[in-house]
Structures are given as C-alpha cells and as structure tokens.
Amino acid sequence: REEQVKFIEDDLLFAAEHLPMPNKAEYGRFSSGFAKMLLIRLYLHETAVNKDYYNKVETVANELMSPQYGYQLQRDYVKMFELGGQGSANKEIIYALPCSYDGPGVNQWHMMVLPTDFAQGGMSGGWATVTSTWAFYDSFEAKDVRRTKLLTSYMSSTGEQINRNTPQSKLAMGPIALKMGYDPRVSASGGHSDIDLILYRYADVYLSLAEALSQKTGASGADLAKAVSLINVVRQRAGLDNLSVSNLNTPEKVLDALLTERWHEFWCENGQFRSDLIRHHKLVQWVKKINNSPYAEEYKELYPLPLSAIIDGKGAVKQNAGYQ
C-alpha cells in the first residue's frame, strides 16, 4: 500500500509543479490547482490508516487558499449548476468536464433523473434511473438553498401535478435529483445538455481543511474553532445560520457536522461521499439511518473481485471477505 500511495503522490506532486496555474490553464484542462486537489483527496483517503496525513492535507489546502491560485466561492450556489453557470468566469471550479449538445463531452444527467412523464421547464421525460430519498431531502434545514433542485413535485405530460403524496407516485422513493438546472434543448438533442459537469470545487478545500484541523492528532480548541468557522463559510453561502463553536467542542462533534455539510454540499457531483463515510467507518451506520436495510454490512464497503481476476491469479489473488 505504501508503495502504491507513494507512486500516486509522486505523480501528483510532479503535475502540481509542472502544470499551469489555474489563471493560466485553459478551462477544462488540468491545472496545478487540480493536481493539488487530488493530492488532498489522496491524503484524506490515507488518514484512515495514518492520521499524520492530516498535516499534509492542511499544508496543501492552505496553499490552494492563497491568492495566487485565485479560487473563490461563487455567491449563488444554485446558479453554479445552471446554463451559463460554469466556464472560466466561475472561480470556484477547480476542475469541470466541458459538455455540449453535440459533444464530444456530453452530460445526460437530466435523462438519468427525470421521470418518464415529466413535462415542465421546457423539458420532457427521461429514463428515471436515478432518484434521491425523502430521508435525504428531510435532512436539510428548511431554508437551505442547496435542496432547491431536489424537486418535490412536477407537472406530468397529462397535466397532473405529481408530488410525494400522489398515489402510486413516481416520487414515492424521493424527490427528483435535478442538480443541473433546466435545459430546454435536452429533449431535442438526444438527451444531451450544455451544462458542464463540475467534479471539484473550492468549497471542498474549505471542508477538507476543516477536517484536517479538527481530526489531526492533538487538535487544539483553536483548531476546532477554526474548523467550525470554515464550515460556517460554506453554510453561509447556503443561507444558513452559523454553527456554534461551543456546541461543537470535540473532534467527534465537528466530524459529524462536517460529514453532514459534505452530504448536503456535494450531492450528485463526484460521488466521493461514499468514500468519505467508508474511511470514517460510518457507511453502514448512515445507510441504516436512511432505510434500516438488513443487507447493509461492512464487507460490502469493498466490491467483489471479478472471477476472471481470481482465476488468472492462480491462487495469488484472493476474493474479498464476504464474497467467497
């Protein structure tokens, strides 16, 4: 494991040194800032086995927050995911995949989440292959703007208003996870949107630094207070009141608040929240909190290895525990 991590780290350090700074990099291409964001994610991943990595997270996060990188939070969370909300003018984006109606990069998120009978905002039905849960929606504070695009109702193609209380509703499991804004051309473009897919944002740096400060070995009261203040910056943009430092006076309490903010801030973006829960040994706990599933077990944190890999390994490759 140490050799593998060192190999990845060396590659990213080289990239961070030789790639252009964000203000010099072409939008949609790799930059020094993106390489350092990936370093942060690598270091966070390794804190599960060595908390000393939090010191590296703290160092790199502070570097990304220096003026020379030019990152800043956007004032409007919702507009960031609407048509025209991306591009080089958006200084919160660390890396995004440019998408357009005619490619080569395509965004089919609307089709993934819209019910088959959806008919509003100039858009028609999708495939409805992804949904959210009402437990997730209800976990937000009422005035949190980040749940704006969790649609709790919609107009159907037959003119019926569908909501969570409609009998046999397509919203029975949860709201529509329309993280991207309305794009009227989706229906006529084969399901493609012109809204770019944002993978990493500056808000992640704030919350990563908050975690490093509060979870590192020997975190002081001042470290905890600073961590809470960083979380509050992200909450303020969402229209929420500040969390109280006096109520979050232990690393464990700060971590719980931090994970909730990650849950609410980055839903349906890059899928890393599952990994965050795993490295803190909280995945099963969170899954059971949502639906109390009897099938949620710790061994499922790892996927089974393909049978072909085990056969080709000729005894050297062992199946992950729980799948034998």
Indicate residue ranges for each PLM-predicted region.
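Elongated scaffold/linker segments in the mid-to-C-terminal portions of large proteins
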Residues: 59, 63-215, 280-324
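Surface-exposed loop/interface segments of Gram-negative outer-membrane beta-barrel transport/assembly proteins
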Residues: 108, 242, 248-251, 271
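Active-site-adjacent helix/loop patches that line small-molecule binding or acyl-intermediate pockets
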Residues: 261-264, 274-277, 281-284
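C-terminal helix-and-tail extensions that cap enzymatic domains
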Residues: 253, 257-264, 292-297, 322
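Extended, hydrophobic/aromatic-rich amphipathic alpha-helical segments that build helical scaffolds
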Residues: 4-20, 27-65, 95, 144, ...
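Secretory-pathway/luminal and periplasmic proteins that interact with or process carbohydrate-rich
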Residues: 47-48, 66-74, 238-244, 264-269, ...
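A glycine-rich, coil/turn loop motif that links secondary-structure elements
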Residues: 23-35, 78, 246-250
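TPR/TPR-like alpha-solenoid helical repeat scaffolds
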Residues: 76-88, 245-256, 261
